[in-house]
Amino acid sequence: MQTVKMYSTLVCPYCVHAKTLLKKRGVERIEDIRVDLDPAQRASMMALTGRRTVPQIFIGETHVGGCDELVARDQRGALMPLLNGAQG
């Protein structure tokens, strides 16, 4: 399974929803980068994604986007192939 990295904050309901979905799909470990604790990480996230909002999710080297994009990818059947190593 691909590595999953998520930029998040503690109180973000979309972050919680995204983590729950990923765990339901078999992801055992999510590298959780808390941008509320480290302003440098928020700046890094914005430089990588061009976005200010959380969550920002990476599966392997693929930037999935936020929670809505993750859910949409799952609904169209494209999340599991990406988690299992397909290019996204």
Where do the model's predicted regions map?
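Thiol/disulfide oxidoreductase modules built on the thioredoxin-like
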Residues: 47-53
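Local sequence-structure signature of Cys/Sec-based thiol-disulfide redox active-site neighborhoods
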Residues: 1-29
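Alpha-helix termination/capping residues and helix-transition junctions
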Residues: 24-27, 51, 64
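Conserved catalytic core of Hanks-type protein kinase domains
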Residues: 24, 48, 73
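Thiol-based oxidoreductase modules, predominantly thioredoxin-like and allied folds used
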Residues: 28-42
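Positively charged, proline/Ser/Thr-rich regional signature most characteristic
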Residues: 24, 37, 69-70
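Non-catalytic, surface beta->alpha helical segment in thiol-disulfide oxidoreductase systems
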Residues: 59-86
